[in-house]
């Protein structure tokens, strides 16, 4: 059994233990590709899977607008109320941090294991919800930058 297979199995198990269906499913999918000798699709997935996933994520967020469940008046409220402005600022900060997290994970993919373990601890002991590696990566990137700044 190759080291890559062991890592994917470990990630899948950690995802299951941490109740992170996304990590577990992604690892299982890659294992399926490995076991069916379809690794030739890895380069395509590496280039396009994140983009495809983000498209589906944005589609799911936009469905309330498309279905008419969010009225134009509600949208305008987000620009003139304090909670709305806080939400806009939070979105800006979160997307920037997610970008930093993605860059960190691309440079240091081995950090994924630590983030999954951290997610498991967060879910098991702190009532957290495992939402994905980008936010954890964003926070890790912030902490790495902070540590470098403090040196």
Curated annotation (Swiss-Prot):
Keyword flag Membrane: yes
Entries under InterPro entries matching the protein: UPF0756_TM (IPR007382)
Major subcellular location class: membrane
Transmembrane segments: 6-26, 52-72, 75-95, 111-131
Membrane topology: Multi-pass membrane protein
Swiss-Prot/TrEMBL keywords: Cell membrane, Membrane, Transmembrane, Transmembrane helix
Pfam families linked: DUF441
One annotated Gene Ontology cellular component of this protein: plasma membrane
Annotated compartments: Cell membrane
Family listed: Belongs to the UPF0756 family.
HAMAP family registered for this protein in UniProt: UPF0756 (MF_01874)
Protein name: UPF0756 membrane protein Moth_0120
């Amino acid at each position: 059994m190759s080291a890559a297979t062991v890592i994917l199995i470990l990630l899948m198990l950690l995802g299951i233990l941490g109740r992170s269906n996304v990590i577990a499913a992604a690892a299982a999918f890659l294992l399926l590709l490995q076991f069916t000798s379809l690794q030739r699709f890895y380069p395509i997935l590496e280039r396009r899977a994140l983009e495809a996933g983000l498209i589906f994520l944005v589609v799911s967020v936009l469905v309330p607008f498309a279905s008419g469940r969010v009225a134009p008046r509600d949208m305008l409220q987000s620009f003139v109320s304090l909670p709305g402005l806080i939400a806009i600022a939070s979105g800006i900060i979160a997307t920037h941090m997610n970008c930093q997290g993605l860059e960190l994970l691309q440079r240091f993919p081995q950090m994924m294991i630590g983030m999954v373990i951290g997610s498991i601890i967060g879910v098991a002991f702190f009532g957290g919800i495992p939402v994905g590696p980008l936010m954890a990566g964003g926070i890790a990137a912030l902490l790495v930058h902070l540590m470098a700044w403090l040196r």
